[in-house]
Design a protein with these regions (language model features):
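Asp-box/BNR beta-propeller blade signature and adjacent active/binding-site loops
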Residues: 1-229
Length: 229
């Protein structure tokens, strides 16, 4: 049966849902005043203990004066003890931002800037079989040669925590419509390769956007990165 609306004014639905240690789920999303897509933007969190039928009253978990945090991507640390949340800075006045929680999302650290290489929009990532993180997003790093295109960052969780650049970034797909791409889906396939899916205008001409998948393995991109050095 169709459930009634939650009544949470927002720009878009949850951009991240993560399972908590007690089996409940934490949903994160962003909004502006009145739920509209205008500054100042803030990130909110809500919980469900019944599989999504009901949700708690949302609480603001991230906001910064002069910055517009949005599109949270939340994931768990390799040891399972910490939640990490990557956020877009919507005005592109700064790098992206990141915050951490060690109490299952009840409280969060103050948002801080990510490394330059993780600066962008619409982050989504997976853990590769070797334990490294592969995070895909629309590149918006200042002075980046791949600004506006679909890229992936490869590195460790410790790199993110310490503000290190990680192993490398790689351009996955070229956008022929400016920076109009992203909102990726990411899957690790049974053979260990990674499937990244995005909407993108992948070739010039009259054709408009398509939904495109690109498949790669960290071993393959490692070789490409080494060859580029």
């Amino acid at each position: 049966r169709e459930m009634p609306p939650l009544g949470f004014p927002c720009v878009m639905t949850f951009s991240s849902v993560v399972r908590l240690a007690d089996g409940s789920y934490l949903g994160l999303y962003h909004r502006g005043p009145g739920g509209r897509d205008r500054p100042p933007l803030e990130v909110l969190a809500t919980r469900t203990a019944d599989g999504g039928f009901t949700w708690s009253e949302p609480v603001v978990v991230a906001k910064l004066k002069g910055r517009n945090l949005c599109e949270p991507f939340c994931f768990r640390s390799p040891d399972g003890e910490e939640l990490c949340c990557l956020m877009r800075e919507n005005a592109h006045l700064d790098r992206s931002f990141i915050m951490f929680s060690r109490d299952e999302g009840t409280t969060w650290s103050e948002p801080v800037k990510t490394p330059w290489g993780l600066t962008g929009d619409r982050h989504m990532g997976v853990s590769a079989p070797d334990g490294r993180l592969v995070v895909a997003f629309r590149d918006k790093a200042k002075n980046s040669p791949t600004d506006g295109h679909f890229v992936a960052w490869v590195g460790s969780y410790d790199d993110i925590k310490a503000g290190r650049p990680g192993d490398y970034r790689i351009k996955l797909l070229h956008s022929h419509a400016g920076s109009d791409c992203g909102y990726p889906g990411m899957e690790v396939l049974p053979d260990g390769s990674i499937l990244a899916t995005t909407y993108i205008k992948y070739r010039p001409g009259a054709d408009r956007h398509s939904v495109v998948c690109t498949r790669f393995s960290p071993a393959e991109t490692d070789r490409l990165a080494e060859a580029a050095d």
